[in-house]
Amino acid sequence: MIPGLIADDSPFAAQYLGALFSSDPEFRVLGVARSGTEAVHMVQGLRPDIVCMDVNMPGGDGYSATRAIMASTPVPVVIVSSDTDQDHVTLSFKALEAGALTFIAKPPGPTSPGYARTVKNFLATFKAMAGVKVIRRTHAGSLADAPYAGISATTNFRFPDPDPNFAAQTGNG
């Protein structure tokens, strides 16, 4: 059983998402948060295995709520949105930067073409993400700030000059 929390300020969307999760016996919805702040408090109290986090909510959007969750009570977060007008790649990077594991679109209604397949993929994503181990974020800097294998981001590293005979040796000359 995968206990999860839904964070969505729309009663209709929260009920719809709850019905999707309840349709799969592997999920159990622990509760619904109506704001980002409420989501953070509910995660601390309920300790779900996964959070389905809406982007646009009062009391802190899904990104700020995800940051707070990852700083206090790390748990896998999947950010979802029905707003498909924005660039999906941009939203995905914002979700990852906040600490979410992924960003996906909310499934369309049951009359949409491919509805069953879309819901199956949606639920499969949550099942996979619920098993991911997450840790508390203690440093908010960029990757360029972190040392890697003893080489700092400021080290003047230079690749060696290529072998002039390489192309001929590999038959690509």
What is each stretch, according to the model?
Residues 1-173:
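Strand-loop microenvironment adjacent to phosphate/nucleotide-handling motifs in alpha/beta enzyme folds
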